[in-house]
Amino acid sequence: MLIAVSTNIIFIVVNTICVILGKYSVQNKKNESYSIANINLAELLASMSLGHIISSATVLGLKSLNLIQ
């Protein structure tokens, strides 16, 4: 069974928002090695983890309301 395009779009949008918010809210000064866009690994992992949790809850909620398939 293929995943619907709407599910993929929700995951991409929510994860992008979480990474942007995590860049400014998570401040880990112990690890100073920065990757792309001046965000370190701890900030990236925390943001992506939260993004996946919020995305999963959003998709399940929208599917239970029959707004997406």
Curated annotation (Swiss-Prot):
GO CC terms of this entry: chloroplast thylakoid membrane; photosystem I
Transmembrane spans: 1-21, 42-62
Subcellular localization, as worded in the UniProt entry: Plastid, Chloroplast thylakoid membrane
Any one GO biological process: photosynthesis
SS bond list: none
The keyword Nucleus appears for this protein: no
Alphabetic keyword roster: Chloroplast, Membrane, Photosynthesis, Photosystem I, Plastid, Thylakoid, Transmembrane, Transmembrane helix
Domain of life: Eukaryota
Keyword check for Nuclease: no
Note: Although originally identified as Cyanidium caldarium, these sequences derive from Galdieria sulphuraria.
Family of this protein: Belongs to the PsaG/PsaK family.
UniProt protein name: Photosystem I reaction center subunit PsaK
Source species: Galdieria sulphuraria (Red alga)
